[in-house]
Amino acid sequence: IPGQYSLQQNFPNPFNPSTEIRFDLPSDGYVNLEVYNLTGQKVKTLESRNMQPGFHSVIWDGTNHDGEKVSTGMYFYTIQAGTFYNTKKMLFLK
């Protein structure tokens, strides 16, 4: 079990067609992991549920909440778990 919360840089980055996002949870709790575009609009929710402590990873397939491929560009992914909040950038290239 990890000793602290963390959000790692996605890999690969830049990516196409998909990328892996890893995060660590030292305790169980509700996790919200979301992708946003440069204008701050939510593109997709990757996780929104109670999760157990441990080392986790999620694959984002470069689609929005309607299942459509997103445009080339910079995206942000954010995690909120308890009092932990973090944001990182990733680049989708077609």
Language model features: what each stretch is:
Residues S48-M51, H65:
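Short, flexible helix-adjacent loops and helix caps
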Residues P14-N16, P53, V70:
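Short coil/turn motifs at beta-sheet boundaries
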Residues E68-K94:
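C-terminal tail/sorting-segment detector
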Residues I1-N37, T45-S48, S57-W60, A81:
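Glycine-centered coil/turn sites that cap beta-strands in beta-rich domains
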Residues V58-V70:
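Signal that preferentially marks extracellular ectodomain short beta-strand elements
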Residues V43-K44, V70:
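Generic structural signal for well-ordered beta-strand positions
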Residues D28-Y30, P53-F55, T72-M74:
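Extracellular Ig-like/FN3 beta-sandwich strand-entry sites
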